[in-house]
């Protein structure tokens, strides 16, 4: 990343050399956490001796893991933050002690040498845009259970829908970009699937595309998350935009652009969470604007219903202490109606009226928000409870 010492980020040779010559693991580590107090390392899996390794992967305990992965030095990156970009690597996790690569996919034009394809994009050569994957591939239904679609955010390239029917050869079948895309930021950072049942018909087949702000103090065009209708996976459509958070009335600034640090969305609540999801409620970390909670029951007009802005520490003359903003992550416990956030100054546990009365006592997780992750979790609950029909009891984990 750009710093006062290296203001041009990867375009400063000294910083770039440090990054590309890193000697540590580029890949993933798998652990057995049967005993959470003593995790046991099963394997260190290298995705390549060059490139970025992995960053923000998707794995729900099934056969396959979807890695946000840079496996070599041929995946181009315009933005100053990294020397190379990432794409998708799918690996077989059947034996977590012996991971096997299944396939790779990247946007045509993303690799050096694919110049004709790359030059079709307006941002080619701008040294600003994020030209790669950032949040791996979200696969709402496991391939081994009959699922065949994955949704991935590829920065300035947009969101791609991949057909995984032949998982050894993923194929793009759908694509969407925001029509007012601008230089900078990560327009499509991650893609979050809304978990909606028949009681919430307007939210079925909906995805939320999150962007990530990159530059402090709004030194780039502001982006906002998008509600995306994927009923037709070959023709995904942006149908709604999230409102821009406003500064609290008692804040010493009237706009978050003046609050120091990054202003914009980053990571959202986790897809897999304790309890039964409340599909109309969505929470996301917003850097210097804290955590924001939205009512998305009308997907064409998401509405903010709550926020929490934690203290933002840092010295005004110490760029490294404030440039990222503060709030990076959030996690919702639907069974206890709690929101956890991770910030650079510490972690917070929050309640929110939109979720309901908080439960502060520890409790065992009876069920998870994603149906297929409950199989094997509780042997006393029939499979039909999660999947309908007259299915048998889940096999033990």
Question: What are these model-derived regions, one by one?
Answer:
Residues 1-397:
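Feature marking well-ordered beta-strand scaffolds used for ligand recognition
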């Amino acid at each position: 990343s750009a710093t006062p010492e290296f203001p041009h980020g990867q375009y400063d040779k000294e910083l770039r050399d440090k990054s590309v010559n890193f000697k540590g693991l580029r890949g993933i580590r798998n652990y057995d956490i049967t005993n959470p107090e003593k995790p046991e390392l099963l394997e260190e899996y290298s995705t390549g001796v060059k490139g970025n390794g992995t960053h923000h992967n998707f794995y729900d305990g099934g056969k396959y893991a979807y890695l946000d992965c840079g496996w070599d030095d041929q995946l181009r990156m315009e933005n100053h933050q990294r020397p190379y970009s990432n794409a998708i690597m799918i690996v077989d996790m059947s034996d977590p002690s012996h991971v096997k690569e299944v396939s790779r996919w990247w946007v045509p034009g993303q690799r050096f040498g694919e110049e004709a394809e790359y030059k079709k994009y307006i941002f080619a050569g701008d040294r600003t845009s994020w030209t790669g994957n950032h949040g791996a591939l979200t696969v709402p239904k496991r391939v081994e259970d009959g699922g065949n679609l994955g949704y991935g955010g590829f920065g300035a390239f947009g969101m791609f829908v991949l057909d995984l029917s032949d998982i050894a050869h993923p194929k793009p079948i759908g694509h969407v970009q925001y029509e007012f895309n601008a230089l900078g930021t990560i327009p499509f950072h991650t893609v979050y699937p809304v978990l909606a049942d028949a009681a919430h018909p307007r939210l079925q087949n909906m995805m939320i595309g999150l962007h990530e702000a990159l530059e402090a103090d709004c030194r780039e065009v502001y982006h906002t998350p998008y509600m995306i209708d994927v009923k037709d996976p070959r023709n995904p459509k942006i149908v709604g935009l999230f409102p821009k958070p406003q500064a609290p009335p008692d804040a010493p600034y009237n706009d978050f652009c003046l609050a120091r640090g990054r202003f914009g969305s980053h990571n959202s609540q986790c897809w897999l969470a304790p309890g039964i999801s409340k599909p109309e409620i969505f929470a996301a970390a917003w850097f210097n604007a804290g955590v924001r909670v939205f009512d998305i029951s009308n997907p064409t007009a998401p509405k903010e219903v709550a926020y929490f802005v934690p203290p933002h520490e840092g010295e005004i003359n110490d760029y490294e202490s404030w440039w990222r903003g503060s709030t990076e992550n959030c996690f919702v416990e639907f069974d206890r109606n709690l929101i956890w956030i991770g910030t650079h100054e510490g972690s917070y546990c929050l309640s929110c009226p939109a979720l309901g009365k908080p439960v502060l006592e520890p409790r065992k997780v009876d069920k998870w928000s994603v149906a297929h992750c409950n199989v094997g979790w509780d042997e006393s609950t029939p499979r039909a409870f999660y999947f309908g029909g007259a299915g048998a009891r889940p096999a033990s984990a």
